[in-house]
């Protein structure tokens, strides 16, 4: 398993652990970081060097990628949403599951 794959799995493990501890905020953070790892690998394999290492910036970058499906761009949009004053998402989505889907789909597109 390569370094980025280990980091990706670690973030998803941490997200599940945070969720088990009823820490939804930390689970969202881990989901975003996992997405950032997959996006960096996706862009690197396409020969694109992102200008920022931030997962949030990378998610914003792919939200407008015309080569990605509308579903994946919507997931990127969800992963960049701000929580309300009650620390809730303004939409009813499972960001960990959505991040997994985004990662899986991006990595399928770059698999040899």
Indicate residue ranges for each PLM-predicted region.
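Hydrophobic alpha-helical packing segments in soluble, helical-rich domains
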Residues: 27-45
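Generic structural signal for well-ordered, non-membrane alpha-helices
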Residues: 6-13, 33-37, 74-77, 101
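Short, charged, amphipathic alpha-helical segments
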Residues: 25-32, 93, 97
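Long, charged low-complexity segments
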Residues: 43-44, 48-112
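Charged alpha-helical initiation segments
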Residues: 1-23
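Short, mixed-charge, low-aromatic patches
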Residues: 13-16, 31-35, 52-61
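A general secondary-structure boundary signal
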Residues: 11, 27, 83-84
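Short, surface-exposed loop/turn segments at secondary-structure junctions
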Residues: 21-25, 48-49
């Amino acid at each position: 398993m390569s370094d980025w794959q280990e980091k990706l799995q670690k973030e998803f493990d941490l997200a599940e652990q945070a969720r088990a501890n009823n820490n939804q905020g930390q689970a969202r953070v881990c989901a975003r970081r996992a997405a950032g790892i997959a996006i960096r690998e996706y862009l690197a394999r396409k020969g694109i060097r992102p200008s920022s290492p931030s997962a949030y910036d990378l998610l914003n970058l792919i939200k407008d990628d015309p080569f990605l499906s509308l579903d994946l761009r919507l997931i990127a949009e969800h992963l960049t949403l701000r929580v309300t004053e009650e620390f809730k998402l303004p939409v009813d989505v499972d960001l960990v599951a959505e991040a997994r889907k985004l990662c899986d789909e991006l990595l399928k597109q770059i698999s040899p």
